[in-house]
Amino acid sequence: MSSLRHAIQRRAHKERAQPLERQRLGILEKKKDYRLRARDYKKKQAVLKSLRQKAAERNEDEFYFGMMSRKGPGSALTRGKGFTGTVDGDRGNKALSVETVRLLKTQDLGYVRTMRNIAAKELKELEERYVLAGGADQPVEEFNSDEDEEESGSKQAKPKKIVFFEGVEERQQALEKQKADEEMKDYDEEEDGYDFDDEEEMTEKEKEERRKQLVLEKLARKVKAARKKLKALADAEYELELQQAKMAKTATSGGFTKSGRRIKVRERKR
């Protein structure tokens, strides 16, 4: 009963609170909490020390099968600070069978073939429109598009020139003039070389010829882009057909043997 009597009289224990500016850090740490944290820290430091010693004294010819799950030796060195310690092993992804992959390539081939047929129809319509617009005498290759100029590198870089000014006002006036010239140049390029000053001097026939030439140039650019798209789709279709043929169960043409000879399959005589 004496212990119960003392327990009733004992004051309730309260944790010491942090000062107002340190309330975000939680309650104050006691000595027992510090001992646990220090013991855990020293234990981890001892483990790291032993691991460093093992790494320094390791055998270069050592091998165990856990190494097979790594990309290469020293992942921490190749990946740098982003290395988390995990190795690239089995992620649970199941490898698809050859038959399944071949079926998927068949679906891809069907999609590419459909898009190639659509692109071929579009190209045919554009070529017919180009001929009807009067481009039978002018081949499409005569018109140089912007893409051709970029690929050929015909646009040379402008030489840089350093200009010195006496004052800030003179420099500001020169910058405003340069900006106005660039805006005027962009406006002229948008008009595609169409000069409004010569419009009054031109006759109706010349105006019609000029409009016809602009339409032909526009159609020629579209025809070139359609041909480029059709060629890319045809190349993709050929590559998919070749991959599908190489994945067949029997030997097909397009592959090579281990000795380097090309596989040639002859059809059975009928």
Curated annotation (Swiss-Prot):
Localization per Swiss-Prot or TrEMBL: Nucleus, Nucleolus
Ranges annotated as biased composition (Basic and acidic residues): 15-24, 168-182
Chain intervals with Basic residues compositional bias: 259-270
One Pfam family named in its UniProt record: Utp11
Source organism, top-level taxon: Eukaryota
Family, similarity comment: Belongs to the UTP11 family.
Function: Involved in nucleolar processing of pre-18S ribosomal RNA.
Record's protein name: U3 small nucleolar RNA-associated protein 11
Originating organism: Chaetomium thermophilum (strain DSM 1495 / CBS 144.50 / IMI 039719) (Thermochaetoides thermophila)
